Amino acid sequence: MRCPTTWRGCARSSWAAAPPTSRRGPPGRVPARSGARPVGVDFPERRLATARAMQAEFGIDFPLLLGRAEEVPCGDDTFGPAISEYGASLWCDPHRWIPEAARVLVPGGLLVFMRYSPLFALCAPPGGRASTTLLRGQFGLGRLEWGERTEFVLPHGGMLRLLRSHGFVVEDLIEVQAPRPAHRDYAEVSADWAHEWPSEEIWKARLAG
């Protein structure tokens, strides 16, 4: 299924592999109920099957497309905002998915994405929990091999230059601090660590035009 041209300029879009398995509901739940026209894009098919099941559970319906963030099955200037919550922004090469985001966004469109922070990437061992020791150098940080998976975390300077090179203007960078008390620890980072240093961050960048 490809993105019909009738979706051009839609008010809200859940784009590029925003995880459909979150128990908060499908990524487009809130915009869909506010009258906007979200579109979900994810890969592989089993993740879309999970998203469809959650659409049924929450009583909403919007298009779900099978596709990769590096090659979104939609035309140029299709979406208003585009969102990636630990999908494209973590598991895809930013030198490929960011130019694709620029292609599918309308001029003035907003890109919002969440990812691991560079500091977390510097302090996290393969298969272990982030510590207070720097385990790798920041220069050259980008592609991280974690055994059976690969993730991408550019330093702040590299990400800023990449976004600017594709016409984006960064509006905000939110470094997320874990609350205290936190509701839980995670396998890759403790709540205490994430309270002292950001393990996650949210970027907001607008396409010029």
Question: Which role does the model predict for each range below?
Answer:
Residues 1-11:
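Conserved alpha-helix/loop element of class I SAM-dependent methyltransferases that forms part
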Residues 110-142:
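Conserved class I S-adenosyl-L-methionine
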